[in-house]
Amino acid sequence: MENLTQKEKNYLLSTIRDVKDFPKPGIIFKDITTLLNNKDAFNFLMSHLAKVYKDKNIDFIAGIESRGFIFGAALAAKINIPFVPIRKPKKLPYITISQKYSLEYGFDEIEIHIDAFSGVKNAKVLLIDDLIATGGTAKAAVELINQTNAKCVEACFLINLKDFGGAEKVAEMTKIYSVLEV
C-alpha cells in the first residue's frame, strides 16, 4: 500500500480546520471543507487514494452520506469505477434495503438500492467516508453492503479519530485504511 510520509500527512492535516464546541460543547469538529476548497490538497489526497486503490480490483465504491459522497465519487471517477450512495432513509427513489444501528441515545438507519451492485456477481466494494469515530455508521454500511450480492472488501476513511475506537470495531468486519489518525 502506498503510504504517506509524515510531512505529507502534516500537510493534509494543516488543511483541516478544528472547530471547538461544534455541534455541542466539548466536541472538536474536524471541518474538511477547508481541505475541499484547497484544490492542491484535494487533488493530492485523491491522487494518493487512486494510487492505493487503482490496482485492487474493486468493482464499486460506496460512499456514506454525505461527506463520503464527496470523496467516494471523486475517487470513483479518478479510477473509473461506479459509485454507489449509501443514504439516510427515504432519500433513494427505488426499492431499498436498510440497516439500523445504535447511536449514543437512540437509533439511526441507512439505505441502499436493492440493485446497487447489479451486473457484477460477488462485487468487491470499497466503502469510503470522511472520518470514523465510534464506527456505528461504518459497521452498518459494511453490513448493508454484505446484505446484497456484494462484499465490502475494505473501508477507507480520511480521518480516524483513534480515541473513539471505531476503526478497531470495523476492522473485525473488513480491512481498514485511514489516511490520517488523530
From Swiss-Prot:
List the Gene3D superfamilies. 3.40.50.2020
Q: How does it assemble?
A: Homodimer.
What Gene Ontology cellular-component terms does the record carry? cytoplasm
Q: In which pathway does it act?
A: Purine metabolism; AMP biosynthesis via salvage pathway; AMP from adenine: step 1/1
Keywords of the record, alphabetical order, are:
Cytoplasm, Glycosyltransferase, Purine salvage, Transferase
Membrane-spanning regions, if any? none
Q: What is its EC number?
A: 2.4.2.7
Q: List the subcellular locations.
A: Cytoplasm
Asked if the keyword Cell membrane belongs to this entry, the reply reads: no
Q: Which PROSITE patterns match?
A: PUR_PYR_PR_TRANSFER
Q: Does the keyword Glycosyltransferase apply?
A: yes
- Would you tell me the protein name for this molecule? Adenine phosphoribosyltransferase
Q: Which reactions fall under this protein's catalytic activity?
A: AMP + diphosphate = 5-phospho-alpha-D-ribose 1-diphosphate + adenine
